[in-house]
Amino acid sequence: MTRSDEEAVVEIYRAENRAMVERDQATLERILAETMTLTHMTGYVQPRQEWIAQIMDGKMKYYSSTEERVFDVVVEGDQASLVGQNRVKASVWGGGVSIWPLQMRVNLKRQAGRCQIVSQVASTY
């Protein structure tokens, strides 16, 4: 594991957060594996395509995501993981706008020459 491997993994996480706010479908589709799942704080396990669709249609509207901390970055072979903590301003599934201290446990895998997010679990911190 090199420092540049760790930096590349962190940059994917940061790109995802930017893409959520910017509603950048192309970036999300590029960095999220087709089989990616997002486990929400409610326990709901959401498939990649449904999550992207809800970002695009505004059911999940992200206004901002301010990074506070990224830690436990591990790269081993073709797998990687990290924990990110961001203050996320969003309105979700018809609720009002709130700011959450959102922690994401992110797992990534190198496939076909590129590293993609394969699973994520959300909680608060």
Tell me the role of every PLM-derived stretch.
Residues D72-V74, K89, N107-K109:
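Generic structural detector for well-ordered beta-strands
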Residues V10, N17-R18:
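Amphipathic alpha-helical repeat scaffolds
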Residues R3-E7, Q25-V75, Q85, S98-I99:
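A solvent-exposed, acidic/Ser-Thr-rich amphipathic alpha-helical stretch
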Residues E16, R23-D24:
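Short helix-adjacent coil turns
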Residues G84-S91:
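Generic short beta-strand segments
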Residues W93-G95:
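Outer-membrane beta-barrel domain signature
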Residues S81, W100-Y125:
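Short beta-strand edge/turn micro-motifs at domain boundaries
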